[in-house]
A protein has these predicted regions:
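Helix-turn-helix
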Residues: 18-21, 29-63, 67
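N-terminal intrinsically disordered/low-complexity leader segments
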Residues: 1-17, 179, 204-209
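Short, basic, alpha-helical segments at the C-terminal edge of helix-turn-helix-like DNA-binding modules
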Residues: 70-75
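Residues in soluble alpha-helical coiled-coils and helical-bundle/repeat scaffolds
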Residues: 59-63, 67, 85-88, 121, ...
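Amphipathic alpha-helical packing segments from all-alpha helical-bundle domains
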Residues: 77-78, 82, 103-114, 124-150, ...
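Hydrophobic/aromatic-rich alpha-helical bundle segments in the mid-to-C-terminal region
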Residues: 127-131, 148-200, 204-209
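Hydrophobic alpha-helical connector segments
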Residues: 67, 78-110, 154-166, 190
């Protein structure tokens, strides 16, 4: 007989649900109103909880923002995995991987996060809170990339450098697109990044064989 799934205690389930509402409300507020308009009172209003409930889970606004960003990063990595898993064997996997990453990088939710990171330049407390999240996110991205491209050996430092270049280039281009949209330049940039990824992956496969 199969074991029955054990449900979390009601209080624990309610706490998780409250945190989920707060994090989603925080991200939505960042997208719609920017950092200046993302106040704890507005987040609570959207989430349908009291400020007391918010501060029970997150000691301050910076902690809330960092948690919201980390939760968003996790969902975006999951989206990327699902998207690349749907690529057929007949398709160009490297090209699809680069273009899918660009689609995610230009989502309004992630562009709002870039704005938040920029604000950390003049806010040491916010910068420290986001720094830890960013480090974990980069580690998760690297792990996901290696799973999606198993031909890469474990000690392929050039692959890690390529991944960093691709992500950094896309982040910069995504920020620039907020002010000046240039689809032709975007297309050329994606072709260059695809060529770089293809070369590095090809060399990594040779080293592993």
């Amino acid at each position: 007989m199969a074991a029955l799934a054990v449900s979390p205690p009601p209080q624990q389930a309610r706490s998780r649900a409250t945190r989920r509402r707060l994090l989603r409300a925080c991200v939505a507020c960042l997208v719609e109103r920017g950092l200046a308009g993302t106040t704890t009172s507005e987040v609570c209003r959207r989430a349908g909880v009291s400020q007391g409930a918010l501060f029970k889970h997150y000691p301050n606004k910076d902690a809330l923002l960092a948690a919201a960003v980390e939760d968003l990063f996790a969902s975006l990595v999951a989206d990327y995995r699902r998207g690349l898993a749907s690529v057929s064997e007949s398709e160009d996997r490297v090209r699809a991987a680069v273009r899918l990453l660009w689609q995610i990088m230009t989502r309004p939710t992630l562009q709002a996060v870039f704005e938040l990171m920029g604000a950390g330049r003049c806010d040491p407390a916010l910068r420290r809170a986001l720094e830890a999240v960013q480090i974990r996110h980069r580690e998760n991205l690297s792990a996901a990339a290696r799973e999606l491209f198993p031909q890469v050996p474990g000690d392929a430092s050039e692959f890690d450098a390529m991944l960093d270049v691709v992500i950094s280039a896309m982040q910069g281009a995504s920020l620039g697109a907020l002010v000046l949209s240039d689809p032709a330049s975007d297309a050329r940039r994606l072709e260059a990044l695809t060529a770089l990824a293809r070369r590095v992956l090809g060399e990594a496969a040779k080293k592993k064989s």
